[in-house]
Amino acid sequence: MTYKKLHEWDLSPEEAMKIQNVLREKILFKPFEGEPKYVAGVDLSFPKREEGLAVIVVMEYPTFKIVELVSERGKVDFPYIPGLLAFREGPLFLKAWEKLKTKPDVVVFDGQGIAHPRKLGIASHMGLFIEIPTIGVAKSRLYGTYREPENRRCSWSYLYDNEEIIGCVMRTREGSAPIFVSPGHLIDVESSIRLVKSFTLPGRRLPEPTRMAHIYTQRLKKGLF
């Protein structure tokens, strides 16, 4: 798959934040009509401090049969700084993306969309590069306020930045901690909620695309795949 090159990656943290403030103005929100045929999940891991591993899994929907899996392992130059993870993880993701042959209709990232201090988490940032609808699904809160959702499957409450709705907090499994869902690019909040609900199977905490991407990341990291 091809992508649009928006900026260089050899940047200082200050330069990275300036780029985020520029790119955030380019994010578009729109309803996702109908159902996807193919959905991708993205997960990144760091086997060593300066080595990263990116995995993209493409699945048929609604069967969640894996049709393609690609990965990229390489050196990571940008330091770990909360709020700037796209500058650490983005280059590896894009190298993996170039290997992909199946075009997904929507891409789910293990990370944030617009639920981010500068409204540009990795799902939003990479969405601008790949120009495909993206959703961020994070296991913990980075930004925003919310009311705790009820303790039942698929209960959720909105995530706010002051009075602006920037996503939702969804309890996908009774008794489990909620996940944090926010639109990345080319999709809106309501569509993101609808799709993540439909991607999450009973008894699972995470949506299948990122759950399977994480499983393969761990297998590759251990040399089991």
Swiss-Prot record:
InterPro entries: Endonuclease-V, Endonuclease_V-like
Primary localization: cytoplasm
GO BP terms: DNA repair
Matching Gene3D superfamilies: archaeoglobus fulgidus dsm 4304 superfamily (3.30.2170.10)
Residue sites binding Mg(2+) per the record: 43, 110
Family: Belongs to the endonuclease V family.
UniProt function note: DNA repair enzyme involved in the repair of deaminated bases. Selectively cleaves double-stranded DNA at the second phosphodiester bond 3' to a deoxyinosine leaving behind the intact lesion on the nicked DNA.
Protein's UniProt name: Endonuclease V
